[in-house]
Amino acid sequence: MKLDDIRREYLYAGLSRKDLADDPIVQFKNWLQTAIDADLNADPTAMSLATVNAQGVPSQRIVLLKNLDPSGFVFYTNLGSRKAQNIAENANVSLHFAWLPMERQICVTGVAEKLSIAEATRYFLSRPHESQVAAWASQQSQGIGSRKLLEQAFEQMKNRFKQGEVPLPSFWGGYRVKPVTIEFWQGRANRLHDRFLYKKTDENWEIERLQP
């Protein structure tokens, strides 16, 4: 397999300082809405979440952005998962959004804080019934002997909750990543990409252009 000749040119318009909102959350929402409107045949809310455990070993996975407010970026997960265990040991995380057909990326660094039970419950009850059941059936990140065992656990929980509301599991919840830095990347010709980094100060955000 020869990989070194695989390359493409970036053709979209660039990004200048005057195009940027002073608040990176506003700027993020603008780009996210553009990605949604573009109908990229991919989930525009998908983000790579990178965590590091107490031994300094990194791991990452794709999760979905489920809310965004001035305080940060929200996602949900099993609280016994590897990501949750990593966050308990080291709350510093990174998020990465890649909208490659638009030649855009966003990188976020920040601190993950667990959501309240009330906030997690509100979201959990809005999920499709079978997604709620699946949350009960899976002991995320734990080993299992076969797919059949997982499907059996799902059917058992499906039968358990066939009538009435599915409650929030005690082992399921969410996190809000409170951003410290947010970088916006726009591809440009000749690899002279546009990069702007927002850095949190006491009350505002500083914006700096970075070299590609």
UniProtKB/Swiss-Prot annotation:
> Which Pfam family, giving just one, matches this sequence?
PNPOx_N
| Cofactor stoichiometry and binding remark | Binds 1 FMN per subunit.
> PROSITE patterns attached here?
PYRIDOX_OXIDASE
- Gene3D superfamilies attached to this UniProt entry: Electron Transport, Fmn-binding Protein, Chain A (2.30.110.10)
At the top level, the lineage of the source is Bacteria
- Which residues does the annotation say bind FMN? 61-66, 76-77, 82-83, 105, 140-141, 185, 195
NCBIfam families listed in its UniProt record: pdxH, PRK05679.1
- Name of the protein in question: Pyridoxine/pyridoxamine 5'-phosphate oxidase
State the organism of origin. Hahella chejuensis (strain KCTC 2396)
| GN (gene name) | pdxH
